[in-house]
Amino acid sequence: MTNQDKKAWLLQYRRLDERIDRLEKEKARWIERATKMSAPSDGMPHGSGVSDTVGLAVSKAADLAAEINREIDRLADLRREIEAAIQTVEGSVFREVLERKYIDGDTWENIAVQMHYSYMHVCRLHGMALTRMML
């Protein structure tokens, strides 16, 4: 497996985490829609349009909640796999670079600052860490 393949595999975690965030925002929008909708209060009989719309919004929110839970389970499984792969790398500095980038989602610049290295050195460490990682 090439370093590019390893990097793509590691990036799955961040992408899935971002997907969960998007799903949670979408669920919140459906909940907001459901709470904003209300039946007319003029005492006159009306069709069931508002009720159906509220029901649809609640149903969409519930479907999204179930999907979010499934994705969170996948995320936890993927995190365990990635952490196990990172642990195959000898050297705590290499592991730290991989963890900060692929689990924490830090930028290269932030990793360099936090680890007290130059940006270029962190990039070199990253390349060496990928080469050492066993998948």
Q: Which ranges hold each PLM region?
A:
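DNA major-groove recognition helix of helix-turn-helix
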Residues: 126, 133
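Short coil/turn residues that cap or connect secondary-structure elements
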Residues: 86-93, 121
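Short alpha-helical "recognition helix" segments of helix-turn-helix
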Residues: 110-113
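Short amphipathic alpha helix immediately N-terminal
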Residues: 90-104
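Helix-turn-helix DNA-binding helix
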Residues: 98, 122-123
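N-terminal interaction/assembly modules
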Residues: 1-88, 135
